[in-house]
From Swiss-Prot:
<dbReference type="Pfam" id="PF05996">
    <property type="entry name" value="Fe_bilin_red"/>
</dbReference>
<dbReference type="GO" id="GO:0050619">
    <property type="term" value="F:phytochromobilin:ferredoxin oxidoreductase activity"/>
</dbReference>
<comment type="function">
    <text>Catalyzes the two-electron reduction of biliverdin IX-alpha to the tetrapyrrole chromophore phytochromobilin (PPhiB).</text>
</comment>
<comment type="similarity">
    <text>Belongs to the HY2 family.</text>
</comment>
<keyword id="KW-0150">Chloroplast</keyword>
<keyword id="KW-0934">Plastid</keyword>
<dbReference type="GO" id="GO:0010024">
    <property type="term" value="P:phytochromobilin biosynthetic process"/>
</dbReference>
<protein>
    <recommendedName>
        <fullName>Phytochromobilin:ferredoxin oxidoreductase, chloroplastic</fullName>
        <ecNumber>1.3.7.4</ecNumber>
    </recommendedName>
</protein>
<dbReference type="GO" id="GO:0009507">
    <property type="term" value="C:chloroplast"/>
</dbReference>
<keyword id="KW-0560">Oxidoreductase</keyword>
<feature type="transit peptide" description="Chloroplast">
    <location>
        <begin position="1"/>
        <end position="45"/>
    </location>
</feature>
<keyword id="KW-0809">Transit peptide</keyword>
<dbReference type="GO" id="GO:0010019">
    <property type="term" value="P:chloroplast-nucleus signaling pathway"/>
</dbReference>
<dbReference type="InterPro" id="IPR009249">
    <property type="entry name" value="Ferredoxin-dep_bilin_Rdtase"/>
</dbReference>
<dbReference type="GO" id="GO:0050897">
    <property type="term" value="F:cobalt ion binding"/>
</dbReference>
Amino acid sequence: MALSMEFGFSIGSCFKAPNPPVLISASPNKINFTLRRRKKRFLLRVSAVSYKEFAESALEETRKRIVLEPSHLQEKYSSMTGLDGKTELQMLAFKSSKIRLLRSMAIENETMQVFDFAGFMEPEYDTPIFCANFFTSTNVNIVVLDLNPLHQLTDQTDYQDKYYNKIMSIYHKYAETFPWGGKLTGESIKFFSPLVMWTRFSSSKEKHKALFSAFLEYYQAWLEMTIQVREEMEPSHVRANCEAQHKYLTWRAQKDPGHGLLKRLVGEAKAKELLRDFLFNGVDELGTKTFIDYFPEYQTEDGTVSDKRSIIGKSYETRPWDLTGQFIG
């Protein structure tokens, strides 16, 4: 389950519902009533948020413009119940002539909701990767919304000119409502664009309405890119696109901080399967390079992958792009 590339802190701590405060009273019945009332209030706050509308609206917009058909993954992954018997996981997977995989995962129980929506292109197209990772609990919302660059922008400035410079106004429209959310590691920042909305906030009707609006605007911008992009005919460029997407998927499948939550919900084996075969499908199909091949700095003395979130130790507490989208570090 993908919440973000890497936040520089443990996501796991955010998935625990806060203990409702105990009010001292001479009456045990009154204490129990207060606890139940507070707990109900927390549950209502979570249930008031539904990300189903986000997925439905995105798919509706897509079907207006292109022909979608079910991915082969839809038959294998559609729904799942957590080990607790209460948590529901709902999955959708589609494809088109240009889109290799358009998929969604929604996780919901009494104390949290998670929404992960992503779009990956066929290797013949260099369009960015659509990335929406939203988490809502009783006390916090964590949001990452971006058009992740297929090719790292520090290496290819023409790629930024092609896809980002003309749509920076979308980011500026929501920057004040959704300010920068805190540290991002130096390793993960390479996979984000200057459009990225990385934020944390307390729930409110106004905030979630603004988030829905931002989600649709980002998605419509990405959808327009997929329609306008021309097929790459040069074999070397297709190979470069394929390897770039494989590198991205390999990073996400290995270092996604949502792994811990999935493990608790469905067990270690099923969590790894969901990460590699559904959420980041393509790791085993688009290339043969390993995580260490792409990121040798993570190799330990015994040849395994380090569990550390960051090796270089650099993080960005403030937004590392200027108003024009240029990286300033």
